[in-house]
Amino acid sequence: MSSKKAKTKTTKKRPQRATSNVFAMFDQSQIQEFKEAFNMIDQNRDGFIDKEDLHDMLASLGKNPTDAYLDAMMNEAPGRINFTMFLTMFGEKLNGTDPEDVIRNAFACFDEEATGTIQEDYLRELLTTMGDRFTDEEVDELYREAPIDKKGNFNYIEFTRILKHGAKDKDD
């Protein structure tokens, strides 16, 4: 063994992957159970869940899913479903939150200039007058830790990242 292979804490070459947080959401026994479930669904054992795997698994349960139903299930993933993606999707379902892009796109509907921000007064008006209306106190609570710049722009891209992955450590 060469000394170059010794662990050092000075290198910061590997960026953190967005999906790495999903493994922290579950303990080792839960991850093992998810792995067993994944392997049961992955009928052809290629390391990915595809439409045929879903069909075969549902058929084994006495179901006869339509192509449209299977397509809708497959379209919930942004790409091929490997174990990490499977775990991420389950984590989002169990956490009760929408995927990051769905949340970001909901905010983007009100960002006419595609700046990644919404004026905080305008967002307050939207939140208190449309859909499931927030109270002013709830909006105040939301804004307390929200990324709002000095010009009053609510950065919904950063807010969505914080919502899904937690706040960055700051030296406040």
From Swiss-Prot:
Pfam families: EF-hand_11, EF-hand_7. CDD domains: EFh. The modification Phosphoserine is found at residue 20. It comes from the Eukaryota. Coiled coil: none annotated. The keyword Calcium applies. This chain binds calcium. This is Myosin regulatory light chain 12B.
